[in-house]
């Protein structure tokens, strides 16, 4: 009798779990919960390296496999920028990319993070195309899930760049939401990317939509796989617009998790 009851209970539990998943209509496709100590998993991330300014006159040297700049500890990824007089421009940091290891066309992308603070910091959670099918930036598109510049504390930006809409022309499409405790608490930053539009969220609050006009790739190049990027820049055209405070370093961006779903969980 006990065995029958347990079997029945198991069936009911399985049915309830299946119903919940079906009701939510969302499937987890990929994630990093950062439960591997040390250097971030090379099965999910690669490092981009260099100090050439990255098209924005940034100051940092991005390093690879250096615990000072990127490490996983106690379930959290830390991306940390340091003042370093041995570097030509005076700073080191890290830039992690999932290129070649994880890319998706459409889905719900959510990152739970705590941001650095101070003049000169420029953290970003963003996406670029796996292949530049329509040409180099900005022709093939860019999705900025989260950007924050330290001289404007608490104002978090979600932005889309294309050939027709980009900051070089002053036509980029985006919006901002104030997050007063951005540096002291974790928040979720997300984009729900569908065939017809993108919707941007912070802590589940919707604050920006970008719609597919149906014209051509110059306005919507987002019909191809994109990969994820996590980085902390120093200075640059935007991040360093008000200068760089030399007294604040090191500064860090902490990431609790990165999750990719086929659709937004309800």
Residue ranges: model-predicted function:
Residues 1-23:
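Bacterial Sec-dependent N-terminal signal peptides
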Residues 20-266:
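GH16 jelly-roll
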């Amino acid at each position: 009798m006990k065995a029958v009851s347990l079997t029945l209970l198991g069936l009911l539990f399985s049915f309830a779990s299946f119903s919940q998943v079906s009701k939510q209509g969302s499937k987890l496709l990929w994630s990093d919960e950062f439960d591997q100590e040390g250097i971030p998993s090379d099965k999910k991330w690669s490092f981009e390296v260099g100090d050439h300014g990255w098209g924005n006159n940034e100051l940092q040297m991005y390093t690879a496999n250096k615990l000072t700049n990127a490490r996983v500890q106690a379930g959290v990824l830390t991306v940390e920028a340091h003042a370093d007089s041995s570097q030509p421009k005076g700073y080191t940091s890290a830039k992690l990319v999932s290129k070649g290891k994880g890319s998706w066309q459409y889905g719900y992308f959510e990152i739970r993070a705590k941001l650095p603070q101070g003049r000169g910091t420029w953290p970003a959670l963003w996406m670029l195309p796996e292949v530049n099918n329509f040409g180099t930036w900005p022709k093939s598109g860019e999705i900025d899930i989260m950007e924050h510049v330290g001289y404007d504390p608490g104002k978090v930006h979600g932005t889309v760049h294309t050939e027709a809409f980009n900051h070089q022309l002053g036509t980029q499409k985006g919006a901002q939401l104030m997050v007063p405790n951005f540096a002291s608490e974790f928040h979720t930053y997300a984009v729900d990317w569908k065939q017809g539009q993108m919707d941007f969220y912070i802590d589940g609050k919707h604050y920006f939509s970008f719609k597919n006009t149906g014209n051509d790739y110059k306005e919507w190049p987002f019909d191809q796989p994109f990969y994820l990027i996590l980085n902390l820049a120093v200075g640059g055209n935007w991040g360093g617009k008000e200068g760089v405070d030399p007294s604040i370093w090191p500064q860090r961006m902490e990431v609790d998790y990165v999750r990719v779903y086929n659709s937004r969980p309800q």
